[in-house]
């Protein structure tokens, strides 16, 4: 595995990030705005800024085919941004929520997107041609607390959600007139809107930080605040799961995860690094970290500054070393893990971003 490609964009937290399908455009959620970067050689250069929200932007996602960008924020709003000759044109989405929007993702079909919120509901949004605006339907029951994370099934109908009521759930987000009726699967056959196809608790009933369907859609993984990853294999409509496997770890909690094929999961979070899990219905285990633990070398200027700092510390405190640098590439919590390059068979590259203002592209 080659070394990671590190882009230290700024000294502020990155709440979320998303790449365009050609991987030349990068959208970064920074404070109240979304910054758009363009690939220029080996660097990303700031090209544009999407301004419309007046509170912290919590989610951003670029639709792979249309290139439209959806954003959501603590100001309880979501915008769909479309490219135009004069720049990016925003359209306000009618979310109808009275608490912060927490998370947003396009469905694979790109006909709709889902927004999680602190209002104990999920807004499933779609475009209404007659009125020329984006409207929403609400998934409410049986959610009892803030929705922290969402993930679409490959069929664009089923939607997984994690929340602070400690449950990971699978809902039907079928919208008549927008979706085609999906084929029967292990999650169910007839799937009217708001059908609960699965509801799961991990061993310690901790907050759920991340959810993700396997590439084939027949398994669900979720990360809890007890530092565990749980993998569920559904048993069919109205039947208990064939298997529900919890993998305890000694790390800090994970905040985001992706599948690498059907037999590997990559998760990252408060430990500032990504970890790999491998297994199947018979069992799962953590096999180790993605990165080699070598401290990045300092450049000449940094070495000079470090030497000056050392002598200053010796003079002021009587000690030579006060090194707070972590031996990981990220120097703070990783908020988002995304597939950068790959297919259903496996991931070739993935990207991470976090509180340290770094975006890192990893090669597997």
Regions found by a protein language model. Name each.
Residues 11-19, 55-62, 98-106, 144-152, ...:
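Canonical WD40 repeat/beta-propeller blade segments in eukaryotic WD-repeat proteins
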Residues 23-27, 66-70, 80, 110-114, ...:
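Structural hallmark of WD40 beta-propellers
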Residues 29-31, 72-75, 116-119, 162-165, ...:
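Conserved strand-to-loop turn within each blade of WD40 beta-propeller repeats
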Residues 155-177, 208, 215:
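Beta-propeller domains
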Residues 76, 211, 228, 327-330:
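Feature marking well-ordered beta-strand scaffolds used for ligand recognition
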Residues 1-79, 86, 111:
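Eukaryote-specific detector of the first structured module of a protein
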Residues 178-199, 242-364:
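Terminal intrinsically disordered, low-complexity extensions flanking WD-repeat/beta-propeller proteins
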Residues 1-4, 34-47, 77-98, 109-112, ...:
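Per-blade loop-tip surfaces of WD-repeat and WD-like beta-propellers in eukaryotic adaptors/scaffolds
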């Amino acid at each position: 595995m080659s070394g990671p490609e590190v882009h230290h964009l700024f000294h502020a937290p990155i709440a979320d990030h998303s790449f365009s399908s050609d991987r030349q455009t990068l959208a970064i959620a920074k404070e109240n705005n979304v910054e758009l970067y363009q690939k220029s050689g080996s660097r990303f250069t700031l090209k544009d800024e999407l301004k419309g929200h007046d509170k912290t932007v919590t989610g951003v996602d670029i639709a792979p085919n249309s290139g439209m960008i959806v954003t959501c924020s603590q100001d309880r709003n979501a915008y769909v941004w479309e490219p135009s000759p004069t720049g990016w044109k925003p359209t306000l989405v009618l979310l109808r929520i009275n608490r912060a929007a927490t998370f947003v993702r396009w469905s694979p079909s790109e006909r709709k997107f889902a927004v999680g919120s602190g209002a104990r509901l999920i807004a499933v949004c779609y475009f209404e041609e007659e009125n020329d605006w984006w409207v929403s339907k609400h998934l409410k029951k049986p959610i009892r607390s803030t929705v922290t994370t969402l993930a679409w099934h490959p069929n664009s109908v089923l939607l997984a959600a994690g929340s602070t009521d400690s449950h990971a759930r699978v809902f039907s987000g079928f919208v008549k007139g927008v979706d085609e009726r999906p084929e029967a699967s292990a999650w169910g056959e007839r799937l009217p809107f708001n059908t609960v196809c699965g509801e799961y608790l991990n061993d310690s009933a901790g907050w759920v930080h991340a959810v993700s369907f396997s590439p084939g859609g027949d398994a669900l993984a979720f990360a809890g605040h007890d530092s565990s990853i749980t993998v569920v294999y559904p048993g069919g409509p109205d039947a208990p799961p064939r298997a529900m496997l919890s993998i305890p770890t000694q790390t800090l909690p994970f905040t985001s995860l992706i599948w690498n094929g059907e037999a590997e999961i990559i998760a990252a979070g408060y430990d500032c690094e990504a970890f790999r899990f491998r297994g199947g219905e018979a069992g799962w285990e953590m096999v180790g970290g993605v990165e080699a633990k070598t401290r990045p070398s300092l450049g000449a200027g940094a070495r000079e500054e470090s030497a000056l700092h050392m002598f200053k510390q010796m003079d002021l405190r009587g000690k030579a070393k006060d090194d707070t640098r972590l031996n990981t590439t990220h120097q703070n919590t990783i908020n988002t893990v995304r597939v950068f390059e790959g297919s259903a068979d496996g991931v070739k590259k993935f990207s991470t971003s976090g509180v340290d203002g770094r975006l890192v592209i990893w090669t597997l």
